[in-house]
A protein has these predicted regions:
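Conserved alpha-helix/loop element of class I SAM-dependent methyltransferases that forms part
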Residues: 70, 80-101, 111, 115, ...
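Class I SAM-dependent methyltransferase SAM/SAH-binding core
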Residues: 101-189
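A short acidic, Gly/Pro-enriched loop at the edge of an enzyme's catalytic core
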Residues: 187-200
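A short SAM/SAH-binding and catalytic strip from SAM-dependent methyltransferases
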Residues: 198-212, 235
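Conserved class I S-adenosyl-L-methionine
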Residues: 228-258
Length: 316
């Protein structure tokens, strides 16, 4: 039985929590970089806890192993189903087309990948058409086997032709649309060569990565010139009154929903805390530029409850 990491590290709920960093935009981006870089620190944050850097990925893995069976249901409840629209908006920005090659990192349950596959399928020409585009490929990449298991089961339910890494056969003619499932760490995409993908998405996953700058550099490496990086993530609310209400909801309601629905208050307490530790919109944009992305911008939803960050790889 998996020991819940959040319970091991649980501490009393703080009496006063700020959703905003008071440091300046420019300097805070470099502070965020250092705090997520294990080469400069022996410890890192796991929610509000300081833990050995080498331990964080395993602690995060245990959290998502615990929440995997109820992950999508909890997303609906926590966001009042708004996460569905945010993911639709994310995929709209990609505008996937037949023949494209896409990677969705931390996408275990397939929520984003299925949307991308649907868009591609709608644009595929009839099988009897004289023109057939190259095969499309959508890769779901996640560190947690439990999340991938849920995604594969959903893919089978929806009728997708899924391919596991161990099942790939180079001698077989690929179908028009391939949906692949890969287990691995966002910081290490070494199984993929440089310039492999047209687009890269990560939805509600980057804040759980131990070394965010390293993951961003890997994202830049595997994208083709002209490729687009898109990240959907909880962010910093701009309006003071909304921020206060959102703070109360996050720390008092979400863990309670997790306890009632998923029988796991502690994991959702960690997830709420991890949102507060994530860099601001400007800080994260600066991190994208440091990783080599250009034309970096972000779009806030609900005044910054979540944001979609975008950047392009323009060099070779």
């Amino acid at each position: 039985m998996i020991v819940r990491a959040a319970r091991l590290l649980r501490r009393p709920f703080p009496s006063s929590i700020s959703l905003f960093s008071t440091s300046s935009t420019n300097s805070s981006s470099h502070d965020a970089d250092a705090n997520n870089n294990p080469s400069t620190n022996n410890t890192t944050h796991f929610g509000f806890q300081d833990v050995p850097t080498a331990d964080k990925s395993n602690l995060v893995r245990q959290v998502f192993e615990s929440v995997a069976p109820q992950y999508d249901v909890m997303n609906d409840l926590m966001s009042a189903t708004l996460h569905r629209q945010w993911k639709d908006d994310l995929v709209d920005m990609i505008a996937p087309r037949p023949g494209c090659k896409h990677i969705d990192v931390a996408g275990g349950t397939g929520d984003v990948a299925f949307r991308i596959c649907d868009r591609i399928q709608r644009r595929l020409p009839p099988l009897h058409s004289n023109f057939q585009p190259p095969p499309s490929e959508v890769v779901v990449f996640d560190i947690n086997p439990g999340m991938l298991k849920v995604g594969k089961e959903r893919a089978q339910e929806y009728g997708y032709n899924s391919i596991n890494e161990e099942d790939e056969n180079e001698n077989q003619s690929p179908p028009p649309l391939q949906l692949k499932w890969c287990e691995g760490d966002a910081e290490r995409l070494e199984r993929f060569s440089d310039n492999s993908f047209d687009s890269y998405t990560i939805a509600f996953g980057i804040r759980n990565v131990t070394n965010i700058p390293r993951a961003l550099k890997e994202a830049h490496r595997v994208l083709r010139p002209g490729g687009r990086f898109l990240c959907l993530e909880f962010s910093r609310v701009q309006n003071a009154m909304l921020r206060q209400a959102y703070e109360a909801y996050s720390f008092h309601v979400i863990p309670t929903i997790g306890e009632v629905v998923a029988n796991d208050r502690d994991s959702y307490q960690y997830l709420v805390e991890s949102i507060q530790k994530f860099p601001t919109q400007i800080e994260f944009s600066n991190m994208l530029e440091d990783a080599g992305f250009q034309h970096v911008q972000h779009t806030n939803f609900i005044d910054g409850v979540v944001a979609i960050h975008s950047g392009f790889k323009l060099d070779k």
